[in-house]
Amino acid sequence: MNDVQSQPLTLYIACPRGLEGLLADELADFGAEVTGTTVAGVHAQADTAMAYRICLWSRLANRVVLCLLREQGIERPEALVEAARRVDWGAHLRAGSSLAVDFHGQSEHIRHTRFGAQSVKDGIVDAMRAAGRERPAVDLKTPDARIYAHLHRGRLLLGLDLVGGSLHQRGYRRDAGHAPLKENLAAALLMRADWPARARRGEPLVDPLCGAGTLLIEAALMAADIAPQLSRDYFAFEAWVGHDPDAWRELQREAQARANVGRRRVKSKLYGRDQSPPAIAAAKANAMRAGIPALIDLQGAEVAQLTRPEGVDGPGLVITNPPYGERLGELPEVVPIYTALGERLRAEFEGWQLALFTGNPDLGHRTGLRAEKQYAFKNGPLDCKLLLIPVVAQRTERETSSEGDEPQGASGATSRPGPRNDGAQMFANRLEKNRKRLKKWLKQSGERCYRLYDADMPEYALAVDVYGDRVHVQEYAPPRSVDPRQAQRRLLDALEVIPQVLGVRPESVHYKQRTRQAGKAQYAKQDASGERFEVSEGPARLWVNLRDYLDTGLFLDHRPVRRRLREMADGKRFLNLFCYTGTATVQAALGGASDSVSVDLSNTYLAWARDNFALNRLDPSRHRVVRDDCLRWLETAGSEFDLIFMDPPTFSNSKKMDAVLDVQRDHARLIELAMARLAPGGTLVFSNNQRRFVLDAAVGERFAVEDISARTFDPDFSRRPDLHHCFLIRHR
């Protein structure tokens, strides 16, 4: 035994935030002396064998660091170098060893981790040279020794990483699946759900949305008493001067023996279900690599089909990590998962314990089950909670009103409605009422794209647009005076009710939050699905995209305006200014326009317009698109047109424009320039969506103006007569 082995070791054991208390308990159970906890870590004293035991057996730790130096007042790189020089590195690093420095933190003068790592490395090299030892080589990928350095508020910790990588990497999870949990976080959730004690009693465990199986595999490793790092082929402490090979081999033999016995003695059966065949395949492959495939029953099944496994009696644990809609557009698909889960649990798993991990507790409460405990965790950057919920057959009383302390759950993943709170039922009733009101008009017109609901009830500030068998939902951002949690509850109510009333699948509902847009923001992508589909409007075929952009490519309120343009266009030269996706040009061309020019500044929308033209077989030599600032183009254009449509944005400050556009301030100038391009006897159709728009009196004095706004709303927009303004303007 050398001097290092004979001395107590000071250790820092790092872990994810929120796991510190659990890790301290785990270390104490191992027999280590816990000396303190800090954010994302625990300090402990241990001998060499105990340090090895922590590396081999900890289910919660990320790293195990042998502390070599702690100092305060480290702000400058020179002080960092000098601190590193004071460590006797020769007592820990073997001659000829390669190293890498992992630097965490910063100071006023050390702002980049790479610079901090370089400073520590320089100090180590200086110290080794001063001691007459060989300079260590740097190997960032596979070093023999990994140096851990942490600097926070001038406090420096330098140490030797005994693992050489993160302990959450068990080696089995090569097929990660969608949004996987890290293994040590999964283990922490299982511990909070009291799984180790439940496994000793032989209770079953079910994960109805198992994904790649991380929760199941970690649960099986616990139940079978298998060390999480038993299959790891290398630890950095094997290159440490103080390494004790005999102690390490003894620990490995002990762990292997426990695993052999544990696999035979497991009383619990574990069940994983997921609707995704690739996820089930990944879970099976991961379980095979973990060495416990016989302990887990994996089958494909949707949440709405969840049943208690055959032959399973008595209570057990249902633990799962459903998607929680961290991206807004996913919410319509996610909400029914939680309510379907609640319904199936009440029907099949009464008396069981549900451990539900979610980044959106309001979604968690959609199960209709009430949590008796909850624990805060971090899942990467996301704040999450583990809700511990006893499964009872009856829905909680809290669900009778959306105004209580907790939101209620509604119906399941199908369109079959279940119990609703008063607000949700009122919203559903309004949707039904609006459908009946529009039914005759829809049948007569043949329209399949229309607005069904537009903030009719102030509590549900949404616009609901139907596009055939798909639905586009926009939430108007609530004012600051509205409690955000109440707004979230009502939104979840609405997203659950909409597919039920309309008879569509939840994944056919696309949700966005609407805020004031300006400049590039109105063109910015919300997603990158590229998921577009064809709709019809009269004789026109048009592409729409409900997912990727704030707008869909088709302004439904302007439908009557486009219809009027089609009726006016026969034989005319047509100009479309601020053309967006070119839908007005398509209608004019189908109405017989001899040729057209469509002008817009956005490459995105001009490409969309070209696709719409191609879909309707418009001749590109007769129907041209031009990328330009409309104001600048009007000032330089020389052509005349018989019919002009101009629908400028209310406000735009795009960098591509020469100046900021404000339609109220600038419309007179725009109209004047457009009229200069209008042939005698022609018509300018001028429209805008400025709610409080007032036409400049000078326009009416110079030109013949007819306000046709009231005639440009179909029944689906008749409740919003201020949504746009429209004028026919002609030369006197």
Swiss-Prot record:
Transmembrane segments: none annotated. Coiled coil: none annotated. Residues 50-162 form the THUMP domain. It is found in: Cytoplasm. Residues 396-424 are annotated as: Disordered. SMART domains: THUMP. InterPro entries: 23SrRNA_methyltr_KL, DNA_methylase_N6_adenine_CS, RlmKL-like_Mtase, RlmL_1st, SAM-dep_methyl-trfase, SAM-dependent_MTases_sf, THUMP_dom. One of its GO terms (cellular component) is cytoplasm. NCBIfam families: PRK11783.1. Specifically methylates the guanine in position 2445 (m2G2445) and the guanine in position 2069 (m7G2069) of 23S rRNA. Belongs to the methyltransferase superfamily. RlmKL family. This is Ribosomal RNA large subunit methyltransferase K/L. It comes from Chromohalobacter salexigens (strain ATCC BAA-138 / DSM 3043 / CIP 106854 / NCIMB 13768 / 1H11). The gene is rlmL.
